[in-house]
From Swiss-Prot:
InterPro entries: Ribosomal_uS15, Ribosomal_uS15_bac-type, uS15_NS1_RNA-bd_sf. PANTHER family: RIBOSOMAL PROTEIN S15, BACTERIAL AND ORGANELLAR, SMALL RIBOSOMAL SUBUNIT PROTEIN US15M. GO terms for molecular function: rRNA binding; structural constituent of ribosome. This is Small ribosomal subunit protein uS15. The keyword Ribosomal protein applies. GO terms for cellular component: cytosolic small ribosomal subunit. Belongs to the universal ribosomal protein uS15 family. It comes from Hyphomonas neptunium (strain ATCC 15444).
Length: 89
């Protein structure tokens, strides 16, 4: 199941640095985390869906790169982000 527009707006509002911010690493990581969690649930019932699994691996790699960038810019914001999203790193 895809992420809904309402849920995406909630994530943007929660993690935005300033009004109208949709491109900061925090917002991008939050949206990717939501999509990754949805795909993880999808794989519990569709174990052989290898096409979507490749997309999942791409999303995880993108999220990891964004997290590395966020960490290089501000350790405090990075720590707050992974704590709020429940990501283990």
């Amino acid at each position: 199941m895809s992420i809904t527009a309402e849920r995406k707006q909630e994530l943007i509002k929660k993690f935005a640095i300033k009004e109208g911010d949709t491109g900061s690493p925090e917002v991008q990581v939050a949206i990717l985390t939501e999509r990754i969690n949805n795909l993880t649930d999808h794989f519990k019932t569709n174990k052989k869906d290898n096409h979507s699994r490749r997309g999942l691996l791409t999303m995880v790699a993108t999220r990891r790169k964004l997290l590395d960038y966020a960490r290089s810019k501000s350790e405090a914001r990075y720590t707050k982000l992974i704590t709020e999203l429940g990501i283990r790193r």
